[in-house]
Amino acid sequence: MTHGGMSGPRVRLAEVVASLSLATDLAGGLPLEHGLRRSLLAVWLGEDLGLSADELSDVYYVALLGTVGCSVEGTLLAKVSRDELAVLGDSAGVDPSNTRDVIAWVLRNFGADEPPLRRIRIVASAIRSGQTEFQIVCRDVALQVGEMLDIGPTIRQALAQCHERWDGAGGPKQLKGEEIRLPARVFNVAHQADLFNRLGGVDAVVAVLRRGRGKVYEPRLADRFCRLAPQLLSRLESEPAWDAVLSAEPGSPRWLAPDELDAVGRAIANFADIRSPYTVGHSSGVAVVAEAAARRLGLSDDDAATVHSAGLIHDLGRSGVPAAVWSKTDPLTPSEWERVKEHPSLTELVLARSGALGHLGTLAGLHHERLDGSGYRGVSSPFLPVAAQILAAADAYHTKTEPRPHRAALTTDAAADDLRGEARLGKFDSEVVEAVLAGAGQPGLPRRKVRPAGLSEREVEVLGLAIRGLSNRQMAEVLFVSPKTVDHHIQHIYDKIGVSTRVGATLFALQHGLVQDRP
């Protein structure tokens, strides 16, 4: 059986990437549509520079996805702040060429709720090495997402360079001048231009670009944008950003074939799940179970494919909730609980603009609803189609079998009993529940005989433990080896798969089907 992929009307790559760009805005604490506006400014600047259609296409996609790697940055910031989205949002007004501004931002946000001595240590560590760690994680994630989206080597390489600076003081590789790909250099100008335009209009944009000229930004690009700023920023307000960004796609639109759509759906699933070690592989697992249940209930091939697609993207809105909330072991406060309950609506929000994906967002937005109206949004039986009931039951079952910060994973038998109990209480339809449980019990795909990147079976085992968030010492206890041996394994794995962080390794494992099913 093959999965139907991202079902529905024909889908342009640009439309999918633009939707993902909206999700990266949420994950980065940035204003919604910042990525779209940034892409427009980048393309218009590129047109004025006389770039070719191929070069403009690279600029277009890099500007849309330039912060995709930073979607996981919040998991690092969550260690020093209770709301990393607010911290990231506050950084939008920081001039990257002004060291005082950067240090003031760190002092304002890092460890604000911690005791004085611990806060001093956090701030000192952030100033000393935190930026490099963030840059490495952003690079690894950007490279993996770029590969999963199959958008070409130039775009992938440029996405990995969006934190580099013209003067070589960026990271993670301290590239300098024209060592940095042109799309990344254009991205840096357009990125700050939109942010500072929101804060202070044309004057603020020109000021920040002039201060950073020759430091953060290529002088030629900064000078050209400063001359064009009144015209470009006025044009930015002339039509809705979504319509404008689709119209601005350089060259002929790229339409995605069914197998490409399925790959893109998995990329979105991985983007949603990567923010927490507790949810790695969750969305793909829900999609498989939900599709199997839909077929058992007699839904058409198209409808079953739609359920599968909605399963892949159902948790995209999690990116708009602080990582610290998802990793909390104590009971949530009322305000934290309200933010958690918003995430299905955020999924619907970021997909609503797309004519091709909007129907999936509507369905995915119902994945926490219950027949008795006790779900997150209070939608009850008459307004819940069978597809939504299937998705909700599949999500509930799969979540029960996964560990969470506040509890251990249930066994499959215990999870099945729980789900049947909820059906008896009127939360789920019993027939839907039985279909979901039957779908979950189907044999999985055979294990790979040849591992990707030349990984050994032992290395695959170590990788599986690492992406679940275990420390080297914890992995050593599980594997009955020394922590030093585990560290050797980790370094060999990183060398083989071409990453340098666990986040990058996690995305590699997801892409290559190495995430093992939980018991």
Task: Label the predicted regions.
Residues 3-454, 460:
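Histidine- and acidic-residue-rich, metal-dependent catalytic cores
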Residues 273, 464-468, 510:
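Short, locally clustered residues in the helix-turn-helix/winged-helix DNA-binding domain
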Residues 280, 463, 487:
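Conserved catalytic core of two-component sensor histidine kinases
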Residues 463-464, 474:
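Transmembrane alpha-helical segments of multi-pass transport proteins
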Residues 470-504, 508:
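Recognition helix of helix-turn-helix DNA-binding domains
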Residues 508-519:
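Intrinsically disordered, low-complexity basic tails/linkers immediately adjacent to helix-turn-helix/homeobox/MYB/SANT
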